[in-house]
Amino acid sequence: MTVTSLSQPHRPGTPPAGAADLVYVLDDDHELCLSLAWLLESVHIRTQCFTDADAFLAAYDPDRPACLVLDVRMPGTGGFRVQELLNAEDAVLPVVFVSAHGDIPMSVRALQQGAVDFLEKPYDPQRMLDVVQAGLHTAGERYARRAARRTVEDRLAALSPRERDTLRQVIGGVPSRTIAKRLGISLKTVDAHRARIREKTGADTLGALIGDMMRCGLDQSRV
């Protein structure tokens, strides 16, 4: 079962275009799915509801900023298994667990595996709205960071092997003259490699490029 809201114009308090504005709800309780969808859509949050894990996993779009409200106990594939499958794919989807039988070990496990929150059923509607809004904010940040990382990785992929060697040395703080000796090339060639690195990556300076890499969590090993 899937429930999808209609497209709505932007209103004050709703996510702007390009922001995270979708919540997946995965719970085998049909009525709970519907009630949560109505709650979220009452504040203009798009919702897609699923009553089984396979349907969700087939519909999940890893390139769309969203968050997931996930029941722990379901027939077949349970909530923790869904979380494991998402983690295995390096998904940046924030997960909010819900359970009618929650306990401390269960909530600790969920959070240790990357969930952003854990709510017990029946949950307070306002608390759920607050948690989901926070999850959508987190989703927007995570997807923006991933997009920036992919952009930097694509630019680095354009470098030749020798340009990569040069960049690794620069990242390590090695002076150009020492780079020339280590790589067995002339200082002029090192300067040419540095210039081509800037040109291919669109960076004003190598320092700016290295700064972008650090912000994206990329180091020498990823060059």
Predicted regions and their residues:
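Non-catalytic signal-transmission and effector/linker regions of two-component phosphorelay proteins
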Residues: M1-Y24, H30, A37, T151, ...
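The feature encodes the CheY-like receiver
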Residues: C33, P75, S99, D103
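Acidic, metal-coordinating helix/loop segments flanking the phosphotransfer/catalytic sites
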Residues: C49-C67
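Acidic catalytic/metal-coordinating carboxylates
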Residues: T51-D52, P75-E84
